[in-house]
Regions:
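Flexible "cap/lid" loop of the alpha/beta hydrolase fold
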Residues: 85-130, 157-161, 166, 186-187, ...
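Conserved loop-alpha-helix segment in the C-terminal half of the alpha/beta-hydrolase fold
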Residues: 180-205, 209-212, 217, 224-225
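Conserved alpha/beta-hydrolase catalytic His-Asp/Glu region
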Residues: 126-169
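Conserved HGGG/HGGXW glycine-rich cap/lid loop of the alpha/beta-hydrolase fold
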Residues: 4-43, 68, 86-89
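Active-site loop/oxyanion-hole signature of alpha/beta-hydrolase fold enzymes
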Residues: 37-69, 84-85, 108-112
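Catalytic His-Asp charge-relay segment
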Residues: 173-179
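Gly/Ala-rich beta-loop-alpha elbow adjacent to hydrolase catalytic centers
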Residues: 71-76, 80
Length: 232
């Protein structure tokens, strides 16, 4: 039996490795690493930036013995895109309603410097908080699960969403884009545009957080991607 690659999870803004727990429970037998990005956290004075995040992603992947598939959610697509150019052990990237930007792009720059109305900006302190997270992130998540997730959200580094990508790993690593068709954080139309950069496109009829609303479906998609990567 062919062994599967290691799966590395990279969370999005305001979140942490905890957001993957329900998916991880459904991936028995898979070697998994869930990264904590320094740009998200509960102490605004200690938040890192995009390049700190990319360094962590590179470091965790480097520590894996064998092939790797990386799954990024939302903002997590930015450090993954930045970090993995030339890392040959990475067999495939999965962008789960994630930011698959190009060289020179930043999340804020993609909006011409105008933040979404649901970003609460703390520019002097260098961080952002989400307004209306229940509506924006968790529209199809059951109320107890959504409430627990909201209680765990941290602050997000403003620098991380302002800094440009200096390289794009999806140019030399194959990728799958998973479009979330009821997403209120990253508009599905924007996801459709980014998905043109991917080798495969899948769709979920979910909000921005399918790892909470449809964890079994996300796990199925990822197991299939791991099998495909192992067979290549």
């Amino acid at each position: 039996m062919v062994s599967l690659p290691t799966l590395v999870f990279v969370h999005g803004a305001w979140h942490g490795p905890w957001c993957w727990d329900l998916v991880i429970e459904r991936l028995s037998g898979v070697d998994i690493r869930a990264i904590a990005l320094p740009s998200s956290g509960h102490d605004p004075s200690k938040l890192g930036d995009l390049y700190n995040d990319a360094e962590i992603v590179r470091s965790i992947v480097a520590d894996v013995d064998g092939p790797v598939v990386v799954c990024a959610h939302s903002y997590g697509g930015a450090p993954v895109t930045e970090a993995l150019v030339g890392v040959r052990k990475v067999r495939h990237l999965v962008y789960l309603c994630a930011w698959q930007g190009n060289v020179g792009d930043s999340l804020l720059g993609a909006r011409h410097g105008i933040p979404p109305p649901w970003w609460e900006m703390h520019e002097a302190e260098g961080y952002i908080d989400p307004l209306r997270p229940r509506e924006i992130f968790y529209g199809d998540v059951d109320p107890p699960t959504a409430k627990a997730a909201i209680a765990r959200l941290g602050h997000q580094s403003l620098a991380a969403v302002s800094q440009p990508l200096t390289q794009a790993s999806w140019r030399n690593i194959s990728s799958t884009y998973v479009i979330c068709e009821k997403d209120c954080a990253i508009p599905p139309a924007a996801q459709e545009q980014m998905a043109r950069r991917a080798h495969r496109v899948k769709r979920l009829d979910t909000s921005h957080s399918p790892f909470l609303s449809r964890p079994s479906r996300v796990a199925d998609i990822l197991r299939n991607e791991l099998r495909a990567a192992a067979a290549d």
